[in-house]
Regions:
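Long, hydrophobic alpha-helical segments
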Residues: 66-95
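Internal/C-terminal transmembrane anchor helices
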Residues: 307-314, 352-393
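Secretory targeting signals
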Residues: 46, 61-72, 115-178, 182, ...
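Aromatic- and glycine-rich beta-strand/loop motifs that create alpha-glucan
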Residues: 2-35
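Terminal transmembrane helical anchor/hairpin motif
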Residues: 3-5, 47-65, 187-284, 289-298, ...
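Helix-loop-helix units of permease transmembrane domains in multi-pass membrane transporters
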Residues: 86-122, 292-294
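Central hydrophobic cores of alpha-helical transmembrane segments
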Residues: 176-189, 366-378
Length: 453
């Protein structure tokens, strides 16, 4: 008598069709709204332009290129919405427990929800592509590769912002915190740069707000950099002195693909970053504890980072606002000491508020006093460092031979200098004024010099 054991080979997959269909049934209104808005922005203008003009005079490549800025904005909005929707089960204890009780690996759950969300947005783009092509053919327009380029651009933009939204969903356990964190990440660099420049204008002698954002700020703000390079707007496309595009600048409409090389470069760089963020989100999802759903911070190591970040980022603008409020009606010059006190107070308040939020209790004292003191100290040191000009900004002048031209603003007049001797005289005058700026503090006149190196 022999016994035979029947075995069945088990297979694991990174994608579960049943979960994908569930996401599609639940979140199809997002796809419907996304595709509907795109139909308003692209197929309808193509149809109207072909109907009101001679089709031979209508440039489909230009029409597609004109929508790139809108593509960035729509991807920003719907990428965040889709990420919040497909991972919303992580924010409730019952739903996350039920989902993780399924005989599916966490990798399968993550990739199914992520790819389904991206596929829904890509399907909307494909529908718009078909409707636009049909409208162009019915209007007598010739199809160009720019239409396919638009599809690639829109789909990659959806991936970029979906990846960013997914990362935000992985690090918090509050559903309402996901869009707040997503919005903060997308504007944090610009906001901190602006606040830092405002503080420097108060404390640093000779500092004025620049006309353009620093390069690092633009690259840390994807929506800003993508709109600049895809939509061909921003300081690099409209220099304040020349008032015209550089001679070597290639317009989107001049390219057969409908997108200039600079736009492709920026898009591919952010796509590579999005892939890295997606892998990072997958790793965080594997280490995320189900019982922490409902907490502001989904990981214990994030709590001190959150407290300190809120204390510093909140204390900076609120400290300046408090200084303005307490200085109303006071006579006298600007008081750096008063500003330091206001910054320290608001930094402590914001730090303790964040501690209460993370700890879900009002009893945070005296345990969180050291962290609050560190926050206040950092803000005070920032003010002192700017006031003392530790980097020598006020005395810094360019070399005369490196200056191509300069524009001087004084009172209600302005003029441009391009002659080398005039530029050399201007640089020397600025150096002399910076060296003797404290000679007579009772009478001061402000002028601005914009150098083009």
């Amino acid at each position: 008598m022999s016994w035979e054991v029947l075995t069945m080979r088990s297979a694991t997959s990174f994608f579960n069709p049943a979960l994908a269909r569930s996401d599609l049934r639940r979140y199809w209104p997002v796809l419907f709204l996304y595709a509907g808005l795109w139909i308003i922005f692209l197929p309808i203008p193509v149809w109207n332009r072909a109907a009101e003009r001679n089709p031979a005079l209508v440039n489909l490549t230009e029409l597609c290129a004109d929508t790139y800025a809108a593509a960035v904005v729509l991807a920003l909005i719907f990428g965040g919405i889709m990420a919040t929707a497909v991972f919303s089960y992580l924010m409730q204890t019952r739903s996350v427990g039920a989902m993780h009780a399924l005989p599916q690996r966490r990798g399968t759950l993550f990739w199914t929800h992520f790819l389904t969300g991206w596929a829904m947005l890509a399907a909307g783009n494909l529908l718009v592509l078909a409707v636009t092509a049909l409208a162009a053919l019915l209007g007598g327009l010739a199809l160009t590769p720019a239409l396919l380029t638009w599809f690639v651009v829109a789909t990659l933009l959806d991936l970029i912002f979906l990846a960013l939204g997914t990362l935000c969903a992985m690090v918090t356990g509050w559903l309402l915190a996901v869009p707040v964190l997503y919005a903060a990440v997308n504007c944090l660099a610009v906001a901190l740069t602006w606040l830092g420049q405002q503080l420097a204008e108060l404390l640093l002698d000779g500092f004025t707000m620049p006309d353009a954002q620093p390069v690092i700020t633009r690259w840390l703000t994807p929506v800003y950099q993508l709109i600049c390079d895809l939509g061909q707007s921003g300081p690099s496309y409209s220099p304040f002195l020349t008032g015209k595009l550089p001679d070597d600048r290639i317009q989107n409409a001049d390219c057969a693909s409908g997108l200039a090389p600079q736009g492709w470069r920026t898009l591919l760089i952010f796509t590579a970053v999005a892939l890295v963020l997606t892998v990072l989100s997958r790793l965080l999802y594997g280490r995320r504890k189900s019982e922490l759903s409902g907490d502001a911070a989904a990981f214990p190591w994030m709590r001190p980072v959150f407290r300190l970040g809120v204390g510093l980022v909140g204390g900076l603008p609120l400290g300046m606002l408090l200084y303005v409020l307490v200085s109303v009606g006071r006579s006298g010059d600007f008081s750096p000491a008063r500003l330091c006190v206001c910054m320290a107070v608001m930094g402590i308040v914001c730090y303790l508020a964040a501690a209460m939020l993370v700890g879900k209790t009002l009893r945070v004292l005296p345990k969180r006093l050291p962290g609050a003191a560190v926050t206040a100290l950092v803000l005070v040191l920032l003010c002192v460092g700017l006031r003392a000009d530790v980097f020598g900004y006020a005395d810094r002048t360019p070399q005369a031979e490196d200056v191509a031209r300069a524009r001087v603003y004084c009172l209600d007049t302005s003029f441009t200098l391009e002659d080398p001797r005039s530029l050399e005289t201007l640089v020397k005058a600025q150096a002399e004024l910076a060296e003797n700026r404290a000679a007579d503090m009772n009478y001061r006149m402000t002028f601005e010099v914009h150098y083009v190196l």
